[in-house]
Amino acid sequence: YGEDGRLQSILEAAGIPYTGCGVLASAVSMDKSATKRYLQSAGIPTAPCMIINKHDAGDLQTLAEKIISEFGLPVVIKAATQGSSIGVVIPKTAQEVVPALEEAFKYSENVLAEKCIKGKELTISIMEENGEPKPLPVIWIAPHSGAYDFHSKYTKGATDYHCPAPFDEKTT
């Protein structure tokens, strides 16, 4: 809570200073479908995806077949408006896709189905210093389970964090 821009809006309306992102950045970043559209409009590549509204989804088995046909398996199914990987499921078999959709729809009216792209999980924080963006060191997030899910994020010892990430300067 407090990450979707509503709290920031209240604080701004009351003239109360706060740290962190403003209203628009918070609202966009907590809605994965809005984030994806924003990044695409800026020319930033993102994983191919399908945005599905709960009320337009129709028969979930038919939808699952369409998702598998378009993206293959494994595929990433995620609730559009949750954080901490809540409502994110990575089905590896066709039989797991419908339950993954049902799980994601518990948390959000909109769900994203995305092509699963294997790779390393990295995070880079950007600070503002003297009005200029300043990147902090790259952090490589290495969950022991292979997926940076809720368990990996909040269970002590389930994930290794490498900072700075052990990549050459060209990569970072």
Task: Outline where the language-model segments fall.
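Short, contiguous strand/loop micro-motifs
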Residues: C21-V23, G87, P166-E169
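A general structural signal for well-ordered alpha-helical segments in protein cores
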Residues: D4-L7, K32-T35, V97, P135, ...
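Short glycine-/acidic-enriched loop or helix-start segments at secondary-structure transitions
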Residues: E3-L7, I86-G87, T123
